[in-house]
């Protein structure tokens, strides 16, 4: 009937010098796998009244719940620090470039839910700006997520929260949330917080928090511009 639709999503990539693989002392022209890899490869079935089901490789329900950001600068500045230079190593202070062996990816983690994987996912219809999601991921992982987006008198608001259980594969569970608001004059404020319980070790929970102040404007007739400043902290990574 008119309420039903079905389709497939196929998204492949050929990475060359991926931002999370580059190093300061890299001595090769490129870092690449010399092959295509899958990002998304799934079937989906959608009903206007019942929601949407996905089968295959793509984002789990909680993927991205730490990244609500209305600043317009997310492509280069986001809570996912490890994806923007995660292999860059810190240097020993006062040395001639001696590496500590500790990288950005070792110290910073947004704990951004379960990522892309083979899964079954369900998204509810959107009610009053709210959408609920859940997925079961290969390896008996599972998660829950909620997302909300509305506009109030010219102010945009976006919220997301998630819980994930990766106990069978990574011996951890976690939860996180993010929020972003953008005023009609272009200034935005975004924030996120997450915590993961590492079950296999007797240590404190990993915690992450992040804040960003942004502003977008039209500097020239060529189009819009956006700037932002952000700060984050990861504990017990």
Where are these regions (language model features)?
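Detector for outer-membrane/organellar transmembrane beta-barrel domains
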Residues: 144-237
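Outer membrane beta-barrel
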Residues: 1-143, 147-153
């Amino acid at each position: 009937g008119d309420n039903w639709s079905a389709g497939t999503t196929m998204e492949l990539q050929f990475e060359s010098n991926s931002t999370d693989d580059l190093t300061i002392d890299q001595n090769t022209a490129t870092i690449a796998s010399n092959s295509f890899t899958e990002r998304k490869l799934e079937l989906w079935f959608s009903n206007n009244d019942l929601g949407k089901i996905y089968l295959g490789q793509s984002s789990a329900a909680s993927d991205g719940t730490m990244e609500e950001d209305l600043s317009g600068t997310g492509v280069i500045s986001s809570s996912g620090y490890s994806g923007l230079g995660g292999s860059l190593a810190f240097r020993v202070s006062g040395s001639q470039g001696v590496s500590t062996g500790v990288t950005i990816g070792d110290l910073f983690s947004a704990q951004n839910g379960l990522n892309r994987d083979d899964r079954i996912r369900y998204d509810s219809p959107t009610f009053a700006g709210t959408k609920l999601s859940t997925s079961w991921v290969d390896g008996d992982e599972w998660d829950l997520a909620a997302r909300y987006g509305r506009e109030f008198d010219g102010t945009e608001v976006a919220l997301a929260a998630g819980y994930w259980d990766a106990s069978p594969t990574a011996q951890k569970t976690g939860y996180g949330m993010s929020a972003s608001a953008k005023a009609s004059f272009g200034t935005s404020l975004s924030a996120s917080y997450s915590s993961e319980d590492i079950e296999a070790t007797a240590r404190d929970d990993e915690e992450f928090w992040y804040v960003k102040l942004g502003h977008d404007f039209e500097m020239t007739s060529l189009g819009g511009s956006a700037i932002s400043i952000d700060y984050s902290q990861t504990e017990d990574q």
